[in-house]
Structure formats: C-alpha cells, structure tokens
C-alpha cells in the first residue's frame, strides 16, 4: 500500500497517487536522504553541509548564506565542505534565474576560463538575444 511506498513522494503527489499531505513512513521516500544525515552527525563523522532547494512540502527551506560562513576562522585551515542540491533541475532551470558571484573563478575550474572556451556560447547569445535558458538548452 501507499504506507510502504519507497518511490519519490513528490512524484506520487504530482501524479495524484497520494494526497499532498502524505508523508511516507520513517526511512522511506524522499525525506530519507535528509533524515539519514543524522546518522553521520551522531557518530562524529565529518560530512559536507548540504544546502537543499526543495518545495515547502518537505519542510525544508532554502538557506541564503555567504561563502565567508564556510571559511575557517584559522588561517590556513581548509574551509568547510558544502554541496548545493537542486531537486528536479531540468524542470526549474528555465524558470529560475541562477546568479553566481565570485572574485576569482579560476580557482573553481580553470578550463572554463581558457581563452576561446566560451566564444561559441557568446556567439549564440548575440545571435538570439532575449531568449530564455530553455531555448538554448533545446539547441542541438
């Protein structure tokens, strides 16, 4: 029955299989990944901080924070690990603006800033001004 459903709760709600207030039993369904992080924390293991962007039905809200909050207070120590988790990116990327700021993106991934790497992207944007992200994603 639905009480033992281990599929994605959000998908079941979308398909009308369950009421929007339905939550699977503990350790099942979508919320398992969030709840299971307690198992790591309780054992004193170091795990990345996971920031999730989810719908309100899971009771998890996005957290706005500065990268400075992840830095160590002691010079030379590594920063805290973190992960940005976006659920169902393919459905939301064309509807949600993604804004990234930074001082030196070469520290993130050097090949992205090599001369000539993004010229094709800029050429497409110049050729089709004012188009949404979905438009460029559909180009082949």
From Swiss-Prot:
Recorded superkingdom: Eukaryota
Induction or repression: By water stress.
Listed GO MF terms: ATP binding; ribulose-1,5-bisphosphate carboxylase/oxygenase activator activity
Subcellular location: Plastid, Chloroplast stroma
GO cellular component labels: chloroplast stroma; thylakoid
Keyword annotations from UniProtKB, A to Z: ATP-binding, Chloroplast, Nucleotide-binding, Plastid, Stress response
Role summary: Activation of RuBisCO (ribulose-1,5-bisphosphate carboxylase/oxygenase; EC 4.1.1.39) involves the ATP-dependent carboxylation of the epsilon-amino group of lysine leading to a carbamate structure.
Family in the record: Belongs to the RuBisCO activase family.
Name of the featured protein: Ribulose bisphosphate carboxylase/oxygenase activase, chloroplastic
Organism of provenance: Arachis hypogaea (Peanut)
């Amino acid at each position: 029955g639905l009480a033992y459903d281990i599929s994605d709760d959000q998908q079941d709600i979308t398909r009308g299989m369950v009421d929007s207030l339905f939550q699977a039993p503990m350790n099942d369904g979508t919320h398992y990944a969030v709840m299971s992080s307690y198992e790591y924390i309780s054992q004193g293991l170091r795990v990345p901080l996971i920031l999730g962007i989810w719908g309100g039905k899971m009771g998890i809200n996005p957290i706005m924070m500065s990268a400075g909050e992840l830095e160590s207070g002691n010079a030379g120590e590594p920063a805290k690990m973190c992960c940005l988790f976006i659920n169902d990116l393919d459905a939301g990327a064309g509807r949600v603006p993604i804004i990234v700021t930074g001082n030196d993106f070469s520290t993130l991934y050097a090949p992205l800033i090599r001369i000539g790497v993004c010229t094709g992207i800029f050429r497409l944007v110049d050729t089709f001004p004012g188009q949404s992200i979905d438009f460029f994603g559909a180009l082949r």
